[in-house]
Amino acid sequence: MRCCGHLKQALSRCNIATIFSAHPRNIESLPLMTGFRPQLWPSLFAVPIVLLCLGLGSWQIQRLHWKEGLIAARQSAVSAAAIPVPQDDAVASGLEFHRVTAHGVFLNDKEIMLGATSEGGVNGYQILTPLREASGRIVFVNRGFIPAELRDRSKRMEGEPTGPVRIEGLLRLPPEGRPNWFLPDNRPDLNYWFWVDLPAMAVADKLQRVAPFYIDADATPNPGGWPQGGVTRLSLPNNHLQYAFTWFSLAVAMIVIYVLFHRRGTESR
């Protein structure tokens, strides 16, 4: 107990000056720790940038969770068992990427050339053919890919069934307008189409009761080998984690620069 009393007395007599007097190096570093004075203009420049970077990083994290949910929902829809395509267009439009079946007769003379595209390094087109169901409704079917040299239908007549058919594939919704500004305009007069525009395709083919969705046929082989189905691209780009890391890194870098700038100013004084 006597030792504890002596220790308390020693600590009571101790002060910052005596501590640093025994350690000159600490005296030199004291201004760096206690003399930090944020300056107005550097702060007005740095703080908004840090807040912006942190906000954008947080937004990318939210986008990451959204994209992961979208990917999971798509995979779940694709892996589910096929169902008959609903006759209610509104119901069917809520089933994008679900596997569906449809029955009807192909209107081969009204097929649409969707391109230019490529498969395995070969340039060509995707063939969208109207399918007339027993109800009279028209559903466009993306039957798959053909090489450019088979654009003439006479070179692939074997792959054009004339009677009732059953098709299975993924229900798809067309884009709302041009997917991006890099695509050329569709040319219905030349049967050159660069994105799916079902209302315009219906007008070009003089068709009525066209469904507001289409079907990507699966990879079941067609007679003659063409078209080759199964062209749906299911993968989604998901770079949000990298983007978030970039924004957070920029925020940290700006904080470091801000602190070092003020430390330099303190040292110079």
Q: What name fits each language-model region?
A:
Residues C3-C4, C14:
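Cysteine-centered motifs
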Residues M1-R2, M33:
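Accessible peptide chain termini
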Residues S12-I16, S21-P24:
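Short, low-complexity intrinsically disordered segments enriched in A/P/G/S/L with frequent Arg
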Residues Q9:
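Cationic, low-complexity basic patches in intrinsically disordered or flexible, solvent-exposed regions
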Residues L30-D89, S93, F97-R269:
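Surface-exposed, charge/polar-rich loops and edge strands
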Residues H6, R25:
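Localized chelating/binding microdomains
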